[in-house]
């Protein structure tokens, strides 16, 4: 399918869905099927799924951000007969489907990470480009904020998340500067944090193309929202709640997420793990899924021209056996 988007509609809702054609092809949508969008956002993917469903089909949409739910309700109004919106994190996938009386789905989509509207809304505190209160919560009813992390977490924990979640090579010195700065005054805003990070980095690093705070902000955001901790359990729950032949499509935006998605899908697609010298299988392990494509799907030139934020997006698809 050639890349084709309604630019005016995407602009109106402040979000351009990434790898949309790949997702729709990967999900192999049936008009009467049951589908789950576990990361609703501004409903760019959900809208196109809903358009392909008949009155007998159903789409369950989850998001932990109540602002996203409100915007999506308006955007999906024409399909309210087949769409159910749920304010919930995808970590509760099994519970939500159980509460709705849905034993299995024919396809599930998860578009990981922070959405464009969350980044662009300065008040949410996700962006290092705008000065705002340190928040970074995808679910604003949750307790932990970025302010809590940078002001309360000990040096070792700060160093660990900057290194593991941000893959920041200057993690030790940045963590030291954060701890030193907060001893004098609490770190309240993204602007304060950016300046602390700048002050911690050597001149050579400040001359690089990438913004000096990018990796640190990613790390803190992941910690606030427990993004990596919830990912593998969600993927396994999704596999358990797919009908045979159902598809799981996952979009990731950085190597940490993609490694987890790739590894978990490969494990779900692997059968017997007995040593090769065993005459018969004793582990009893059978594959739950098969990989639809062994390589990740990435954006083509047309999509990148329309939406540069798709550059780092990777799509992987697996099918329930």
Question: Which role fits each region the language model picked out?
Answer:
Residues 1-321:
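S-adenosyl-L-methionine-dependent methyltransferase catalytic core, i.e., the SAM/SAH-binding region
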